[in-house]
């Protein structure tokens, strides 16, 4: 006999599915902006400690043209959707009590190691599973912090004069760009792992993020 278990509230599902295309557009438009100046410099004053750049063949292979204006327009337009959706998600999570399922507790870091071993088939026994497992709680909470980092570094880059104090906190304009870039790389890596986990866990888990309930098997007496 099949059972239905409530999994994700409607608001959480809306935030999730709004953020998905918006973040993809933000990453793509960010690549268009980055292509205009792919050099990152880390230094103190005029002294350069490190330079990093993505070589042109990468962009040539992906057929990314010089479309700086288009990239800036898309990035600055969709950043408002990204920011508003993210802030609304955090506020909802706090006031609805959903944070209790999301924020890691003192057991999460130990249990997350068990989750990784189980996913790699190095451990047969399934780790403790609540609404989110320990690895999910850590990674989803990290994504929220990364979102905050994106907004703050983005402001430091977008308005380095008006938010000079913020740009200074990140170590200057180039360092803010550097952090912004690597946070974006983190999003891409998270996205790859997230999709792989969705495929691994199957249709029922994916469907729960659409309709809000998970279909399971009733336990016998």
What is each model feature region?
Residues 1-221:
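Membrane-embedded alpha-helical bundles that constitute the cytochrome b-like, heme-associated redox core
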């Amino acid at each position: 006999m099949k059972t239905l278990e409530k999994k994700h509230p409607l608001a959480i599902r809306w935030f999730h599915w709004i953020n998905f295309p918006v973040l993809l557009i933000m990453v793509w438009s960010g690549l268009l902006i980055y292509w205009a100046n792919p050099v990152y410099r880390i230094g103190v004053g005029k002294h350069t400690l490190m330079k990093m750049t993505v070589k042109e063949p990468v962009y040539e292979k992906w057929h990314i043209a010089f479309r700086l204006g288009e990239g800036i327009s898309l990035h600055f337009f969709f950043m408002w959707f990204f920011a508003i959706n993210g802030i609304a998600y955090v506020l909802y999570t706090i006031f609805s009590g959903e944070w209790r399922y999301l924020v890691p507790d003192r057991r999460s870091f130990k249990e997350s190691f068990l989750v990784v071993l189980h996913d790699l088939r190095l451990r047969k026994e399934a780790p403790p599973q609540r609404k989110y497992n320990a690895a999910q709680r850590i990674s989803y909470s990290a994504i929220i912090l990364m979102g905050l980092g994106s907004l703050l570094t983005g402001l430091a880059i977008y308005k380095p004069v008006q938010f000079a104090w913020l740009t200074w906190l990140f170590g200057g304009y180039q360092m803010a760009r550097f952090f912004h870039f690597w946070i974006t790389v983190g999003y891409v890596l998270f996205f790859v792992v997230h999709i792989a986990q969705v495929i691994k866990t199957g249709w029922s888990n994916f469907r729960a993020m659409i309709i809000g309930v998970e279909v399971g098997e009733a336990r016998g007496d």
